[in-house]
Curated annotation (Swiss-Prot):
Spans within the Extracellular topological domain: 28-922
Gene (UniProt): TMEM132C
Gene Ontology cellular component terms for the protein in this record: membrane
Family annotation (InterPro entries): Ig_TMEM132_2nd, Ig_TMEM132_5th, Ig_TMEM132_6th, TMEM132, TMEM132_3rd, TMEM132_C, TMEM132_M, TMEM132_N
Topological region Cytoplasmic: 944-1108
Chain positions covered by the region annotation Disordered: 820-857, 1022-1072
Glycosylation site residues: N316, N373
Family in the record: Belongs to the TMEM132 family.
Entry's localization field: Membrane
Protein's name according to its UniProt entry: Transmembrane protein 132C
Amino acid sequence: MRSEGAAPGPAAPLCGALSLLLGALLGKVIEGHGVTDNIQRFSSLPPYLPVSYHILRAETSFFLKEANQDLLRNSSLQARVESFFTYKTRQPPVLNASYGPFSVEKVVPLDLMLTSNFLGPTNKFSFDWKLKAHILRDKVYLSRPKVQVLFHIMGRDWDDHGAGEKLPCLRVFAFRETREVRGSCRLKGDLGLCVAELELLSSWFSAPTVGAGRKKSMDQPEGTPVELYYTVHPGNERGDCAGGDFRKGNAIRPGKDGLEETTSHLQRIGTVGLYRAQDSAQLSELRLDGNVVIWLPSRPVKQGEVVTAYVTISSNSSVDLFILRAKVKKGVNILSAQTREPRQWGVKQEVGSGGKHVTATVACQRLGPSPRNRSSSLFNEVVQMNFEIASFSSLSGTQPITWQVEYPRKGTTDIAVSEIFVSQKDLVGIVPLAMDTEILNTAVLTGKTVAMPIKVVSVEENSAVMDISESVECKSTDEDVIKVSERCDYIFVNGKEIKGKMDAVVNFTYQYLSAPLCVTVWVPRLPLQIEVSDTELSQIKGWRVPIVTNKRPTRESEDEDEEERRGRGCALQYQHATVRVLTQFVSEGAGPWGQPNYLLSPNWQFDITHLVADFMKLEEPHVATLQDSRVLVGREVGMTTIQVLSPLSDSILAEKTITVLDDKVSVTDLAIQLVAGLSVALYPNAENSKAVTAVVTAEEVLRTPKQEAVFSTWLQFSDGSVTPLDIYDTKDFSLAATSQDEAVVSVPQPRSPRWPVVVAEGEGQGPLIRVDMTIAEACQKSKRKSILAVGVGNVRVKFGQNDADSSPGGDYEEDEIKNHASDRRQKGQHHERTGQDGHLYGSSPVEREEGALRRATTTARSLLDNKVVKNSRADGGRLAGEGQLQNIPIDFTNFPAHVDLPKAGSGLEENDLVQTPRGLSDLEIGMYALLGVFCLAILVFLINCATFALKYRHKQVPLEGQASMTHSHDWVWLGNEAELLESMGDAPPPQDEHTTIIDRGPGACEESNHLLLNGGSHKHVQSQIHRSADSGGRQGREQKQDPLHSPTSKRKKVKFTTFTTIPPDDSCPTVNSIVSSNDEDIKWVCQDVAVGAPKELRNYLEKLKDKA
């Protein structure tokens, strides 16, 4: 019997059905993606087309990994998606992709490079040239209203004298309000530079005009700003820049003198300030001690000029007498010493010559009080000393003057030296020229110095330029970031730097002129990141490899018999894994709290394995080894770490723990992908404009007779990991291909054990190639071949061109396929594979390429959408039959598939071009289905509970009604013989007792449910009772133990209660019901109806129900 409060009956079959549905959906989702039961090893990367990428014609380039990159980006054996970044190149780089005998190349389009080259088309000028502008003086005075701008080409090889082609002209514009002044120059010389001059109008130095209704701006201490711009344009036939010096007052408006064509290409240079005040002569200070200070002109002087040195004393000094000595070399004449305040100071000069030097001694004595009340300056002038530059040995040099002060009875001060710059030229400024604006510090990784050449030039008043690199002095402001050579001819990093920096400064000085060189230094972020496809390596059951001297003698498997252990010198193979080293290049921002800046962005990591390959090692080489710095091979059980060592110190730049387990795994699947050619497509990356995404797709269809194709193979192990077979040594295995239909494809003698070759013979399709993977010949048993794994490859041979490729190509059309195996070139073609039952085996290459790129970038997705419109075919589903799925290995290459699978028999013809809708993937559909089923189950459960609670509340006896209940016994007779009812005879039952007979026949369960769920009104009482006596008696006793009593009830009140309990082995649900009735409705003491007449009893009960 059921207890009260149990779950309602209908929930049990509903929950069971929901459980079955959930299990079926889960099974379908897992089966659809080809995932094995052992999926705990998610560290292994999903399979992809294992092509080799190379970037050609680039000096520095890197392959990239996006942070939190979706593993499903590369999840198809037919395609591989990689992003790369070209840091430095002199010409457009070329991407090369190869696999087996096939290779394909594609030049990176210029619009994907996004270079800031404003020199014009790159077919005339070098690819990496950039134009740099320097404003020589950012302060322009009315006495010298000239602006000079030096331009030079960055990235140009200064030693390449053959690059003397006709360089373009530059036109410079200065704008102030609505007025404009222009000038021009032409790039030339080995350094590729020129100086443009602009003569500003005198009216520009007046205060700016104020329009009506506007307030007059405050005087700007930095001067009136003037914006400078430039444009690039070719010269005329003679190579001249005609009209470069033309000035016009209001030519800024477009449509005047062709300015409409140039203003759209204006490039900003910077801002200069205009000042009306005169440019006073600049003096440099030389402090001898706390009292005496010498002031000398800082500008260079010419031969024959007189230089005046001003000797001053501090205003608060109490010195009354001092002796000043000045010593000069020959070539400088000491003329005179005189004072401007003869009443304040007495001056007496003596000149003495001694060999190569001339010494002047000047005695200065105070005669009167200092004029404190007449001047507020910090220094008072004492004497002026005049020197004449008589001669000099070079065009540019310095003349030193040695100074010393002596105080009577106090001694002398230290010697101080000042320099007078001698030059026959009027220099405006110096400019350090660099090949680039930034430097990549890879010396930290390789130990090789990275240097950048430097040139320093001077510019004169007449815009003449001279190389003064050998005469300058230089110093780095922070040698922990960047260093400069002693000869100041290059800056460099040698790997001992500890940080990078934005706009690191190296100062260059020539005479009194100085100029900074700002360079951004990028350094790798430490520690480096080591990425291993599988950090736990196990032995592979059945794969025995020969033992050589550099391999450990692996312990034999305990499961192998004695025949396998005889002296063959073989041991079990360990799993292999791929290894690569990643990092980010960072640079500190300007200021003390500068945030780090990233090359590209924080979301990108650079593959630097090729840079640190020589410095990678394993701490325990006997546990595992590295092959070519990219393949990890287990040797024996243990734990070790992969380390990247610093080439310059004993420090460790990165490490990764590797475990070689004692467990054994087996090869569960051998995935086969036909490769008849390769095609490559390049797309811009939406995350960063400097990165380029490449998609290489394998061609599956053989289209010409005798065309050859190879196979790409992946191994799947019982631990869930997958690995390309290419990383294993070809000496340890061999692949043998067998054709299932020689009329379609044949298998010639393979040229390489890694790539079996198939040849097209006739049209056909299906799983026509069987590939057997066997262990090395030296480890084969004598009686039988040791086949490690078997794979079945799908082949499609269709002669003729693909109609889907007849549409014209776009900017990012796939490159041509270079089939070196068959010495052909084909356009990238899309195809389908159909099984023998007419169902589709694989999606088209475009659709699978879309699946691989689905999460790559937004821009790539949009481009692929356009490509589907042109080239997609409506025959790309994988709906193979059951029999075929049993013979084909699980296709985990589409784990999980991103493509939409068209239904078979959709009515689309083979060659129809349609726009394929891009819906949800199988994984997404499965997850949404699970979510919907769960929500439905919860909703049904809540509704069922609410329904049961509502019915229970309506049928429960009120508390006040219990007082009117009778003491009479209510009986429920449970028997298994129909004769028990008739044996009661005609004797009526006691007035206070009632017996209800429940039939347990085959149909009674359903009928009892119907009766109880309809409020307890009995429509049928069957006379056949099929039930065991033990069960009925037990249940009868149980209900006798729990009668309902009420001392206040009347004798005629009858309570009718029915309990029914279903044994566990019965198929009927358990139902509980409570029925209450008044004595006016039911009278159980019946004088006119015999108890033994069930038909009459049923009729009587029906009458009572009708009356109610």
